[in-house]
């Protein structure tokens, strides 16, 4: 009579970086012979990977822990909210264990203590690319953990610590395994991608027997040699970022940069403890476009930061008009427990925050709609994400999954997720595109 593998349920919340942590835990669980359960009822215990960045995320995480306790009763908590174990235990004293983020060993120790693995399990081999939560054709590639910045609105360093870069050999081996498994797009993520290697003084590592520096430019060049889409996220606008723009112009990596600028007013940027200035950022953006005219620049901003005046906000709107960014997200400032910004004077009233958010989005939507309209008639390469009847849903090089727009492509016969196809853009709105197979002469 064969022994049955112990079963672990898993709930993953939060950002792509948290998803990457979840994938590592799931991979280790499978490597040790644990089965992964898709339901509370069938699981012997449940691991909940939490988010704790803003109050709404804390509430969602606590609700998820409560649901897992109610439905299963045996719960291990990890992730960013786990860094505040007192908050978790005060709300849910019945949890088995609480660990912080990026804590694979601690999670596995807690699992072993509460659900011992089989001594000699007969398990399926874990694939080289590991267990993934994303679709098979794209994957997040985390290159570092933590952050050396101390932005006044952010508590990430207190939860995830200072910057720790992965060795470039490990990153490239993971990337190769993903590509060999059929991944068509690698999304490079971290807390600060442009700082990759700073903590190890850009130490030289090895990949396939070749020396490669632990540095963003060298990493981008190496990833580009794998022959798949490579998309760069969470890039601070440091001067050395200029080095990867020619790689985009040459088609080695996607002409796409996710650059979190957060504001444009010098006074607010200083209060936020953000690097660079709006003037430098604008000059750098213009220089990038000179080198690579097709570059897509995504950014995020915060309105209603403590002390933000009408003049500061107008400065931000002026920057939007001048920068003509392609993809933009914006949030009304929300106090985060433990953030230095909570102590700043002159908080902005909530109704005014929402008014500014609406005005900001109105300006940006006009910019985005015009940029989308200019794509009508162009032939674009589209990565297929999904098939819905006779229609395919995909993305261009200008669109990251989940946060940007999509392309609705008619005539999906024979297509499947992961395919790269040429399509002619026939219509647009401020977010999405509609396309058809290119007209034949």
From Swiss-Prot:
Cofactors named for this entry: [4Fe-4S] cluster
Keyword check for 4Fe-4S: yes
Chain residues that bind [4Fe-4S] cluster 2: 147, 151, 154
Residue ranges of every copy of the MTTase N-terminal domain listed in the record: 6-116
Record field: catalytic activity: L-aspartate(89)-[ribosomal protein uS12]-hydrogen + (sulfur carrier)-SH + AH2 + 2 S-adenosyl-L-methionine = 3-methylsulfanyl-L-aspartate(89)-[ribosomal protein uS12]-hydrogen + (sulfur carrier)-H + 5'-deoxyadenosine + L-methionine + A + S-adenosyl-L-homocysteine + 2 H(+)
Residue intervals of the TRAM domain: 373-439
Cofactor detail note: Binds 2 [4Fe-4S] clusters. One cluster is coordinated with 3 cysteines and an exchangeable S-adenosyl-L-methionine.
Protein EC: 2.8.4.4
Domain of life: Bacteria
PANTHER family attached to this UniProt entry: RIBOSOMAL PROTEIN S12 METHYLTHIOTRANSFERASE RIMO, RIBOSOMAL PROTEIN US12 METHYLTHIOTRANSFERASE RIMO
Protein family according to the UniProt entry: Belongs to the methylthiotransferase family. RimO subfamily.
Protein name (Swiss-Prot/TrEMBL): Ribosomal protein uS12 methylthiotransferase RimO
């Amino acid at each position: 009579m064969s022994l049955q593998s112990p079963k672990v349920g898993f709930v993953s919340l939060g950002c792509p970086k948290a998803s990457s942590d979840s994938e590592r835990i799931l991979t280790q669980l499978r490597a040790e012979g644990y089965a992964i359960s898709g339901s509370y009822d069938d699981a012997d215990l449940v691991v909940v990977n939490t988010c704790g960045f803003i109050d709404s995320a804390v509430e969602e995480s606590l609700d998820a822990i409560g649901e897992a306790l109610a439905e299963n009763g045996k719960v291990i908590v990890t992730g960013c909210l786990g860094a505040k174990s007192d908050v978790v235990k005060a709300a849910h004293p019945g949890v088995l264990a609480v660990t912080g983020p990026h804590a694979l060993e601690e999670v596995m120790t807690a699992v072993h203590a509460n659900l011992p693995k089989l001594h000699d399990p007969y398990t399926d081999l874990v694939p080289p690319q590991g267990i993934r939560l994303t679709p098979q054709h794209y994957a997040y590639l985390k290159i570092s953990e933590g952050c050396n910045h101390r932005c006044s609105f952010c508590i990430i360093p207190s939860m995830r610590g200072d910057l720790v870069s992965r060795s470039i050999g490990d990153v490239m081996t993971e990337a190769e395994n993903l590509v060999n498994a059929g991944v068509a797009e690698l999304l490079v993520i971290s807390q600060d991608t442009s700082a990759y290697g700073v903590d190890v003084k850009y130490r030289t590592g090895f990949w396939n027997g070749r020396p490669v520096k632990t540095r963003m430019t060298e990493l981008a060049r190496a990833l580009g040699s794998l022959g798949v889409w490579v998309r760069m996220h969470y890039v601070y606008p440091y001067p050395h970022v200029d080095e990867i723009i020619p790689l985009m112009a040459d088609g080695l990596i996607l002409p796409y940069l996710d650059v979190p600028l957060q504001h444009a007013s010098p006074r607010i940027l200083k209060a936020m403890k953000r690097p660079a200035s709006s003037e430098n950022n604008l000059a750098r953006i213009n220089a990038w476009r000179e080198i690579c005219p097709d570059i897509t620049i995504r950014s995020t901003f915060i309105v209603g930061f403590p002390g933000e005046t009408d003049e500061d906000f107008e400065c931000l709107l002026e920057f939007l008009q001048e920068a003509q960014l392609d993809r933009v997200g914006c949030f009304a400032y929300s106090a985060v427990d433990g953030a230095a910004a909570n102590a700043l004077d002159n908080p902005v009233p909530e109704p005014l925050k929402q008014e500014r958010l609406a005005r900001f989005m109105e300006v940006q939507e006009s910019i985005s709609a015009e940029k989308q309209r200019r794509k009508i008639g162009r032939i674009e390469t589209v990565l297929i994400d999904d098939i819905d009847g006779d229609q395919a849903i995909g993305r261009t090089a200008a669109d990251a999954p989940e946060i940007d727009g999509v392309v609705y492509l008619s005539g999906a016969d024979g297509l499947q997720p992961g395919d790269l196809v040429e399509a002619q853009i026939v219509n647009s709105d401020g977010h999405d595109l509609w396309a058809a197979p290119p007209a034949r002469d």
